[in-house]
């Protein structure tokens, strides 16, 4: 299966089982939780999984990194079409993604097909709240368009947020996220906003009991999960391999 994200959880026996989510069937994903709850682990796990299985001919990235830290290591991958960390560049990168989506739909119309057959494009946002606080007027319409029409064009939005409020995750945008990964939250109200029920506030404290526990809301289904953390050296090795001139020349 292609375009998968890692999802792990502990079984009653204590072992770790790692199935996968088919991202092509769940086009958009929101990851939210308090600081230190495991958002970065989940996000890097998704990217790692794609790098280990997909070439730039199959998967492309638009990386939105307002904190300038989490996604910087992926900037020079051959998969990366756009990397943006400054607000003007972020707006331009999102506009490029919208234009690319429109281009794909025009091509589909010309070919009389209902679904795009080219590379999947992942628009990955490390901190959605930063965009909604600082440049909401410019970015919200672009994100809504991507989330509303991206699926048939193989355009996926994956967004992280540690600020769990309606002002920073607008409801019209949130409604387009078919899958939500709710990590530990500060209170029950935030949990209900994320996954439509309480529970995230009672997840293990990441400072004392471990990171990466969460609830996965996938349509009507709700599942308690644990996110697997890939060793950093494995991710670094994958990045190095893809960025090597020998690898690119052999593609």
Predicted features along the sequence, with ranges:
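P-loop NTPase catalytic phosphate-binding loop
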Residues: 1-114, 118-207, 211, 215-216, ...
């Amino acid at each position: 299966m292609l375009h998968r994200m890692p999802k792990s959880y502990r079984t009653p026996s204590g072992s770790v089982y790692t199935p996968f989510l088919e991202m092509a069937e769940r086009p958009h994903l929101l990851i939210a939780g308090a600081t230190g709850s495991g958002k970065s682990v989940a996000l890097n796990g998704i990217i790692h999984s794609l790098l280990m299985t997909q070439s730039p001919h199959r998967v492309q990235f638009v990386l939105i990194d307002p904190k300038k830290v989490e996604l910087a290591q992926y900037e020079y991958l051959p998969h990366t079409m756009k990397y943006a960390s400054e607000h003007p560049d972020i707006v331009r990168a999102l506009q490029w993604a919208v234009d690319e989506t429109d281009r794909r739909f025009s091509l589909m119309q010309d070919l009389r097909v209902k679904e795009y057959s080219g590379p999947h494009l992942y628009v990955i946002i490390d901190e959605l709240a930063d965009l909604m606080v600082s440049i909401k007027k410019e970015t919200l319409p672009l994100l809504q368009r991507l989330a509303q029409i991206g699926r048939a064009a193989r355009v996926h939005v994956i967004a992280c947020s540690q600020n769990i409020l309606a002002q920073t995750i607008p409801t019209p945008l949130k409604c387009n996220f078919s899958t939500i990964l709710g990590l530990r939250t500060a209170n029950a109200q935030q949990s209900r906003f994320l996954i439509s029920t309480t529970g995230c506030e009672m997840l293990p404290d990441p400072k004392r009991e471990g990171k990466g526990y969460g609830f996965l809301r996938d349509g009507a289904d709700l599942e308690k999960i644990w996110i697997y953390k890939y060793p950093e050296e494995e991710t670094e090795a994958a990045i190095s391999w893809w960025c090597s001139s020998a690898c690119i020349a052999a593609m």
